[in-house]
Amino acid sequence: DFPLSKEYETCVRPRKCQPPLKCNKAQICVDPKKGW
């Protein structure tokens, strides 16, 4: 299994973001509270 990506790291499959980060259209993990 892959480690969860931190802020501004990739979330290209099969990588996933650490909560509460979300994957944006550029496939980067971002904090939704800060906007996209």
From Swiss-Prot:
Q: Which residues cross the membrane?
A: none
Tissues and organs where the protein is expressed, per its UniProt entry: Expressed by the venom gland.
Q: Which GO MF term does the entry hold, naming one?
A: calcium channel regulator activity
Can you supply one Gene Ontology CC term for this chain's record? extracellular region
From which domain of life does this come? Eukaryota
Entry keyword set: Calcium channel impairing toxin, Disulfide bond, Ion channel impairing toxin, Ryanodine-sensitive calcium-release channel impairing toxin, Secreted, Toxin
What are the disulphide bonds in this sequence? 11-23, 17-29
> Where in the cell does this protein reside?
Secreted
Kindly give any further remark recorded in the entry: This toxin may reach its physiological target by traversing membranes, which may be by slow permeation. Alternatively, scorpion venoms are known to contain amphipathic helical peptides that form pores in the cell membrane, and it is possible that these pores would allow this toxin to enter the cell.
Task: Describe the function of this protein.
Answer: Affects the activity of both ryanodine-sensitive calcium-release channels RyR1 and RyR2 with high potency. At lower concentrations the toxin increases full openings of the RyRs, and at higher concentrations it inhibits full openings and induce openings to subconductance levels and reduces the number of full conductance openings. The different actions may be attributed to the toxins binding at different sites on the RyRs, with binding at a high-affinity site mediating the increase in full openings and the induction of subconductance states evoked upon binding to a lower-affinity site.
Q: What is this protein called?
A: Insecticidal toxin LaIT1
Species per Swiss-Prot/TrEMBL record: Liocheles australasiae
Q: Identify the taxonomic lineage of the organism of origin.
A: Eukaryota, Metazoa, Ecdysozoa, Arthropoda, Chelicerata
